[in-house]
Amino acid sequence: MKMRRHRLVSRLACLLLLSCSVISVEAAQKESQTARKLAREGYVNIREVDPSIHVSLMYGRADNFCGVVLYDDLKEAFLHPEAMAALKKAQAYLKQLRPDLSLKVYDAARPMHIQQKMWDKVKHTEKDIYVSNPAHGGGMHNYGMAVDITLCTLKGDTLDMGTKIDYMGSAAHIDHEDRLVEEKKISKKARENRQLLRKVMRYGGFIPLRTEWWHFNKCSRATAKKYYKVIP
């Protein structure tokens, strides 16, 4: 009886190990080629470092300002380790202030070949002022030193920020939000939410972009060019 029980336990253990191996293989297969390349280059997966941060890559869908899918295989958000440490700090501070909220990342490290696809889509249009030209070295996303981000509930529902993320217009600017409220282009609550987002991101060490409430850089372009490398 004991021998049969021992054999049964052994078989169950083998089946468990086999199922775990299959799951590991499937997980590796699901990870995109771009994700593996970013990891090899030393960039870190945001969700692996801090699972409490929500991720929804907007360029993995067509509902972005370009109107097309730019990330064919990338589903995960990556950052330079220094930027990731700053983001983790910002998330922790947000949790201190508002335990019911979380940061939600819409874009992070962006390979330069994706930047080229984006530029080709908008060049010679009114939108090209919002996109860094790869011929000029690209932008901070191309160093893994920038995030497009918002606030959300613990379920992932985004808060009112006045405009959709990726909205190209003056209502997305952060330097005249009081006027935007007076003109009823954004609500007082949206202004409050933007201010909270900037507060926690600045605490983490990020620099807001004047024309996009959702965009934050970890360092200046000059610093990035001097000390960091572009993601090909």
Where are these regions (language model features)?
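Juxtamembrane helix-loop transition sites at the ends of transmembrane segments
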Residues: 1, 20-21, 128, 226
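Bacterial N-terminal signal peptides
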Residues: 11-21
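Short, well-ordered surface patches within globular domains
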Residues: 114
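Bacterial N-terminal signal peptides that target proteins for export
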Residues: 2-13
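Extracytoplasmic cell-surface/polysaccharide-interacting catalytic and binding patches
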Residues: 26-108, 118-121, 125-211, 220-232
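Conserved metal-phosphate-binding beta-hairpin within the catalytic cores
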Residues: 216
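Segments that shape or occlude catalytic/ligand-binding pockets
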Residues: 111
